[in-house]
Amino acid sequence: MKKNNNWILPVAFIIFIIFWKFISDEQPVPNPKIEIYNSSIESIIDVSSEIEVLADSISLPEGPVWDSNSKSLLFVDVMGNKLYKWNETDGPSEYISPSGNTGYAPNVDFGLLGANGLVINSDGNIVICQHGDRRVALIENTPSTNPKFVTVVDNFEGKKFNSPNDLVYSSDGSFYFTDPAFGFFNLQTFQFVEDEVKNLDFNGVYNFNPNDNKLSLVTKEIDLPNGIGLSPDNNTLYVNKMGLLDGNPRIISINLETNESSILFDGKELSESYEGNFDGMTVHSSGNIFTSGPGGLLVISPEGDLMAKIDFGHLTNATFDDDESYLYVTGFVNNPKVYRIKLN
């Protein structure tokens, strides 16, 4: 009697499907927007993580910082002169208005006059860089449509700052900040404009200690300093040099014991292939620098090696939450969104 083997193919097909599903479940699909150049960074970056959009239609989002007290992300709209708050329950909402231009200091009408970099100090207060008011200030009452700003520092040797841009606190209670002239930048013509109300003829990087009100000029040799960060041991200061003026975007490393500067990472080659600038940055507890740059978000090791790139589009800044389980980033005017991605 001839055996009927017609059942073999259907059963084999079912086994194959089950096996394929098992393999697929066990092997997450890598996100094509994440490029890994050094496998050691995979201890931090999950190559299968998806990019989430948290907010859009913000004219120029910037200055993201995680507020551990309210479990919220704070960020500003530089062009809209507002500060926003995002959390899992409510999504994005307007939190403080105005944020960076209140009439405190003379400025020009066409500049980028809203706030920019933010930090939460040890007392839980927001310390904010204000382009329009040309100072670093502390916000006393939040949330508010009539916020009270207290000046922390607003001049160098009696001359008003340009447009304080970004800042980072040191473990000794002082903070470092950058002072490029974006309050005098015409976004229509994409040019910096000299004006009689501009008092300083350089773009500085400073240290200010609120305990004794001592202001020190760290360097004035970086033509357009922007994002700023500190190594975990607080011995090295990182400053993003945008390169808009000379075409040489770089990350500058400053030894705070010797005050010697060096080029940590040269972004010129990347800038010839990708859109984006060395704008804001944040430093991971591992010492790796997560910075906006050509191609999106770049991860640079303390030794200056490119570890990874995540294609969020053209970015302005980045930050982590308390336990570094998420990375939050903000986009430029041609990419006006706030994103996050899950980390390992």
Residue ranges and their predicted role:
Residues 21-344:
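Sequence-structural signature of mature extracellular/luminal beta-sheet repeat domains
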Residues 11-12, 115:
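N-terminal leader/targeting segments
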Residues 2-11:
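N-terminal Sec-pathway targeting helices
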Residues 13-22:
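Hydrophobic alpha-helical membrane-insertion segments, chiefly the h-region
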Residues 1-2, 175:
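Short linear motifs centered on Gly/Pro in flexible linkers and helix caps
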